[in-house]
């Protein structure tokens, strides 16, 4: 029996936000298991491109490409480079972009990838095979810097305590396994009443730092602004407050909302670049109760969507 296909979070809401049309060109910037790509292809007779930096996801995408009759193409790379990657393929504009930020459930479910504290595996956490791993970061980062990483990216109030415990443990033996790290963290972070594992925030922080996820998200949003055609839609799904804050801040600024003390006060003329996006919804969209019950990962998901205006993309400082 073949396995059940992976259904991404907020799938119906993302497709509704993109509103694919038959002659459109669309980008799935975080292919993963391909759920968004397949849904976009099924929604209209359109052309779909996809990007992923995970070699496993790229191989999965190549299989879909082979049976797509020329409607789907897979590109290996980072979504933060989406505009340059598509230009290399002769594509200068797209009509919609979907982004599902962070680690996928399929990556977490593979112990050998080192993302999970629930399943022992090598302490890796890299979405691609190059660059320093989580083990390198845990074993070699000075205590103060490690505490700052855990606090900033994991929002862990006990970050100093965790960093101290890690440094003391690594003096005896370098960390190599996810289980070793999780055990050390659980000894110094008490279990909360919400049932969340004490190691959750530390693992999140390391994963974000190893993969530069927030920097990649910022670059991806700016690239999407350059790549979207006027009237094109951007749909971004996030899973924790740090990601959502980046998306919310970007879209509020680019839509002119950030410059207003109140939505009832008109935008001041000449106060900055023209709005490059118009919000499709003032508030983030969350999962329906049925989806939240069926998929625990969906509970924290938020979708923010906006339409590209005809205004030029804002200048960015690299």
Curated annotation (Swiss-Prot):
Chief location: cytoplasm
Highest taxon above the source species: Bacteria
Binding sites annotated in the UniProt record for S-adenosyl-L-methionine: 34-36, 52, 79, 100, 107
Gene Ontology MF terms in the entry: rRNA (cytosine-N4-)-methyltransferase activity
Reactions catalysed according to its record: cytidine(1402) in 16S rRNA + S-adenosyl-L-methionine = N(4)-methylcytidine(1402) in 16S rRNA + S-adenosyl-L-homocysteine + H(+)
Enzyme class: transferase
The protein's name in its UniProt record: Ribosomal RNA small subunit methyltransferase H
Function of the molecule: Specifically methylates the N4 position of cytidine in position 1402 (C1402) of 16S rRNA.
TM segment ranges: none
Pfam family, one: Methyltransf_5
Keyword flag S-adenosyl-L-methionine: yes
Swiss-Prot/TrEMBL GO biological process terms: rRNA base methylation
Keyword presence, Cytoplasm: yes
Composition bias, Low complexity: 303-318
EC number(s) stated in the UniProt entry for this protein: 2.1.1.199
Cellular-component GO terms for this entry: cytoplasm
Cited InterPro entries: RsmH, SAM-dep_MeTrfase_MraW_recog, SAM-dependent_MTases_sf
Disordered: region residues: 286-318
Keywords: Cytoplasm, Methyltransferase, rRNA processing, S-adenosyl-L-methionine, Transferase
Protein family: Belongs to the methyltransferase superfamily. RsmH family.
Subcellular location(s) per record: Cytoplasm
UniProt xrefs under HAMAP family: 16SrRNA_methyltr_H
């Amino acid at each position: 029996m073949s396995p059940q296909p992976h259904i991404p979070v907020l799938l119906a809401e993302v497709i509704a936000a993109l509103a694919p049309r038959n002659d459109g060109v669309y980008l799935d910037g975080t292919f993963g298991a391909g759920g968004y790509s397949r849904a976009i292809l099924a929604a209209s007779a359109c052309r779909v491109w996809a990007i992923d930096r995970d070699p496993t996801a790229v191989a999965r995408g190549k299989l879909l490409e082979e049976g797509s009759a020329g409607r789907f193409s897979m590109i290996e790379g980072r979504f933060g480079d989406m505009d340059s990657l598509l230009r290399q393929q002769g594509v200068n504009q797209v009509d919609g972009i979907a982004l599902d930020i962070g680690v996928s459930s399929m990556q977490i479910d593979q112990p050998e990838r080192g993302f999970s504290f629930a399943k022992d595996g090598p302490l890796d956490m890299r979405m691609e095979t190059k660059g320093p791993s989580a083990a390198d970061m845990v074993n070699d980062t000075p205590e103060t810097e490690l505490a700052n990483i855990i606090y900033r990216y994991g929002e862990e109030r006990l970050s100093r305590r965790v960093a101290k415990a890690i440094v003391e443990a690594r003096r005896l033996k370098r960390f190599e396994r996810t289980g070793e790290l999780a055990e050390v963290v659980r000894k110094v972070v008490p279990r909360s009443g919400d049932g969340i594992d004490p190691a959750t925030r530390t693992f999140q922080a390391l994963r974000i730092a190893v993969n530069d996820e927030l920097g990649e998200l910022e670059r991806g949003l700016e690239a999407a602004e350059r790549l979207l055609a006027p009237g094109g839609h951007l749909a971004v799904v996030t899973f924790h407050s740090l990601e959502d804050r980046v998306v919310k801040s970007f879209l509020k600024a680019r839509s002119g909302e950030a410059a207003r003390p109140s939505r009832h006060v008109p935008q001041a003329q000449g106060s900055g670049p023209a709005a490059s996006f118009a919000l499709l919804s003032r508030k983030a969209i969350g999962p329906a109760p049925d989806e939240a019950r069926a998929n625990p990962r969906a509970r924290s998901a938020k979708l923010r969507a906006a339409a590209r205006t005809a205004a030029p993309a804002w200048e960015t400082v690299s």
